[in-house]
Amino acid sequence: MQREKDSLIVVSGGMDSVTLMYEKRASIALALSFDYGSKHNARELSFARLHAERLGVEHLIIPLDFIGQYFQSDLLLSGGDIPEGRYDEENMKSTVVPFRNGIMLAVAAGLAESRGLRRIYIANHFGDHAIYPDCRASFIRPMTEAVRCGTTNGVLIEAPYTDITKTDIARIGASLGIDYAETWSCYKGGVFHCGVCGTCVERREALHDAGIPDATEYEG
């Protein structure tokens, strides 16, 4: 018996959300992406669209122009240069987009209820905890309860990667046959991955530690 497609997924086009989309594809009716004015939005969104089409999942891109216009973050086109280094270094905090996941989950909740969907998937993971407060379990738990209480049909948020690492996610993706060269991570949003910003460093380490050949094209 085929499982009911009763879920939507917030998908950026990066390793984590693409992996989750493949893992939960049997239940996903809608893939939801956001154009919020980040330096790497265009690069990410092309891969989100690619994988949604490949899986036969409807894909929506919702503009959140106000974030790029009014919020402060070096991740945004309106911000400064992307710092280089690991996620846990102090300078990477400048890439935080305030309450980004909260805003996206709120929009996703309204859309899920409008579509009669019961579940939202989001692919935050343990490696995000160091600098992104809206990726931590301490945020996801109360946000889940708020969405459940604030929707008529009790929409649920499921964040199954919250307590696992990007290396763990890479292993899941490898078991699903995902080609990670068809995902985007780099915050700089250039032609190639820079290889030295926090998300590039994490990507390289995750693939290496998972024993997966890294076919990503890096600058230099």
Swiss-Prot record:
Free-text comment on the cofactor: Binds 1 zinc ion per subunit.
Positions that bind Zn(2+): 186, 194, 197, 200
GO BP of this protein: queuosine biosynthetic process
Keywords, comma-separated and alphabetical: ATP-binding, Ligase, Metal-binding, Nucleotide-binding, Queuosine biosynthesis, Zinc
Positions of ATP binding: 11-21
CDD domains, per database record: QueC-like
Cofactor(s) recorded in Swiss-Prot or TrEMBL: Zn(2+)
EC code: 6.3.4.20
Pathway terms, separated by semicolons: Purine metabolism; 7-cyano-7-deazaguanine biosynthesis
Principal EC category: ligase
Family designation: Belongs to the QueC family.
NCBIfam families, per database record: 7-cyano-7-deazaguanine synthase QueC (TIGR00364)
Listed PANTHER family: 7-CYANO-7-DEAZAGUANINE SYNTHASE
Protein name: 7-cyano-7-deazaguanine synthase
Protein species of origin: Porphyromonas gingivalis (strain ATCC BAA-308 / W83)
Gene: queC
